[in-house]
Amino acid sequence: MSIASKFTFVGELIISKPKDASHSNFYSEWKGGSKENIPMRKISFGIKDSPSNSAFVESFGREWDSIRAVDLDGNKVEIPWEDRNTEETLKILPYHKKFIVNLGPDYGDRHEFAAEYDMIKYLAENLKDFKGKLCVTGHWRKDAYKGRFIDKFIIKDVYAVESDRKSKLELSMDFFYTHDSVDTADEKSEKKIYINGYVEQYIDKDTGSQYLPQ
C-alpha cells in the first residue's frame, strides 16, 4: 500500500439503521478465529459532506496476547495486552502507533488507545448520542471481493470540529498513469476529462504489491 494513501473526511455523522434486532451495521462484537474464541469488534459509520454525498469509514479490532511496536526511541517493544492502555505504555508509543479520539469536553476531550479494539468500543458507546460535526482521518485501501475491488476507509483518528468547518471527502494517494490514460471524449460536451490510472496496493506476503485500476 502506498504510504500516501490517506483520507480526511469532514462532515455530519451517519449511523445506519440496523437490518434487524439481531444485526447492527454500526457496531458488532463476536468471537472468531480458528477456534472461535478470540473476542473481535467492528464499527462502521458514515460522514456526509453534502445532502447527496457521503462515505463510510470502518475499523476492525481483536484481542491479542501482546502488542508489538517501536517506541519513541526507535526500540522494538512488546507490550502485554493487559498493559496496552496504561499511562506508561501510551507515553512511549509514537503518534502513528496510537488511535486518538476527541469528541469534545462533554466526552472528556482527548482519549488515546494503543489498539483499535478499545477505540472501537469507545466510539460505539459515545457516537450514538453525538451531535455535531466530525473529522475522521485514516488510511485507504482496496480489498478484493467477488472478483472486484472495494474501497475501504480505515479509521485512525476521530475529532469533533466546529460547525462552520468546511465539509469535505478528501483522498491523498500516489496515482500512476501512462500517456494513454487520459480520456477526452466528453471534454467538449460535458467539459470533463477522465484519467484512468492505477494505485499501488499491497496484496499479501506471496504476491507483494500490485498496481490496481482506480
Summary of predicted features, one role per range:
Residues 1-214:
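OB-fold and OB-like single-stranded nucleic-acid-recognition modules
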